[in-house]
Regions:
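Conserved Rossmann-fold dehydrogenase catalytic segment
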Residues: 149-150, 187-192
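An N-terminal, well-structured beta->alpha segment
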Residues: 2-44
Length: 220
């Protein structure tokens, strides 16, 4: 197999995933706006959840939200059976991800969320799924096909879900009027944080400065 053929495989995968993201624009409706509004007015935290690849995507979405002004963290729905349910309160909002909207582990978690009167926003590829029906607001993320040549491995679908999570985070940033200095507050170790937050006093050395008395001779 020549290098040109191998490169064409990669190029096609990128085209498929790029198109999958662009296709999501057609599904943008007032549910997206309502989801952003609910997250903006949340008095607690955004609890992002999902299983498998959706869980990995959810963890990244939670990290992006948290670093851009919206308190959030990821929770594995399997862990709630072993004490993690204690981190949740009725002031929170759950953001649940599932391509099918029918993931068993996630659906077993949802009744607990409803019992605690916690509102649910879901991102799925099936607006008629049980998860969508349980949700206060549902955002459809549907792809025509996966970038995987077998149309099996989650590729285009996870990319589209991740991009939709970024869209939520970016919309929230703009609603909050999030500024570079706000960003720096959450990234004190990054280059931007150091540049915006470091003052002259932080780097100035005053206690051990070598001071030469004026009466001292050059030879000394």
């Amino acid at each position: 197999m020549d290098n040109k053929t191998i490169r064409s495989y990669g190029e096609q995968a990128l085209r498929d995933e790029a198109q999958a993201i662009l296709d999501q624009i057609q599904y943008m409706d007032d549910n997206f706006e309502k989801a952003v509004d609910m997250m903006f007015h949340c008095q607690g935290k955004i609890i992002v959840t999902g299983v498998g690849k959706s869980g990995h995507v959810g963890a990244k979405i939670a990290a992006t939200l948290a670093s851009t002004g919206t308190p959030a963290f990821y929770i594995n729905p399997l862990d709630v059976y072993h004490g993690d349910l204690g981190v949740m309160t009725d002031k929170d909002v759950v953001l649940a991800l599932s391509n099918s909207g029918q993931t068993d582990e996630l659906l077993r978690f949802i009744p607990m969320v409803l019992h605690m009167n916690i509102p649910i926003i879901s991102i799925t590829g099936n607006p008629d799924s049980l998860l969508a029906k349980y949700s206060n607001h549902h955002i459809t993320v549907k792809v025509k096909k996966e970038a995987c040549p077998l149309n099996l491995a989650p590729t285009s679908s996870t990319t589209a879900a991740l991009a939709t999570g970024d869209a939520l985070a970016i919309a929230l940033m703009q609603v909050r009027h999030f500024k570079p200095r706000d960003f720096a507050q959450f990234h004190p170790g990054g280059e931007l944080g150091k540049r915006l937050l470091t003052t002259a006093e932080d780097v100035m050395r005053s206690d051990d400065m070598p001071i030469i008395p004026k009466e001292m001779h050059l030879g000394e």
